[in-house]
């Protein structure tokens, strides 16, 4: 614990593990199973409970509550965890819950993520790296969020939804279906409004890759053939385009929800349905 500073008003329970150069601010409460890695900073009134791991050099602001029991009536009080990666910024009032013993039992957040004020990550979610939750963005239980996703302020995501990497959800949207990689969704209920072009450019995709994705998505939601045939056509036509295959593979994996589609498309479509 070399270089670690704990304010005299903070409560760090016996058993908690603190790394080096950790700062624990006034009135924080750290539970006995918490693990705080090197270089983390907790401002004032932060609560970290349960088997929660906070990755190195992460910063948590006032009144954030991490690792409390899941809001899941099926949870029976069993051993579950919350794991947060390194270099994460967790702003005021953010809440993240541990997994539930009726499911995978783990809530996982990747590295280099930003959670703005009052964002919420529910039980059994899996959030990738370099993800941004704007103010009041909320995801329900069992949601999967890919790398480099941005969720706009005041937006909510239904339980079991999958969000592909580099996707973008506009502010004050309600996403109830799976969103393809690179997709942009807006509205209540959110519809696919095109591709996240800015995100693709930031990811280093070349112009030809962006054009291929645009054409592939147009083919997928053309509605002239059964959806399964469209998926197979795109897979064959763009067999050498990794970015397109990312979208195809995401669709073929098929989660528990339907897909977020354009406004004119059937918003309950699944790959195994005509």
UniProtKB/Swiss-Prot annotation:
It is an enzyme of class 2 (transferase). One of its GO terms (biological process) is lipid A biosynthetic process. GO terms for molecular function: acyl-[acyl-carrier-protein]-UDP-N-acetylglucosamine O-acyltransferase activity. It is found in: Cytoplasm. It holds the Pfam family Hexapep. Keywords: Acyltransferase, Cytoplasm, Lipid A biosynthesis, Lipid biosynthesis, Lipid metabolism, Repeat, Transferase. Its EC number is 2.3.1.129. The keyword Lipid metabolism applies. Homotrimer. This is Acyl-[acyl-carrier-protein]--UDP-N-acetylglucosamine O-acyltransferase. It comes from Bartonella quintana (strain Toulouse) (Rochalimaea quintana). The lineage of its organism: Bacteria, Pseudomonadati, Pseudomonadota, Alphaproteobacteria, Hyphomicrobiales. The gene is lpxA.
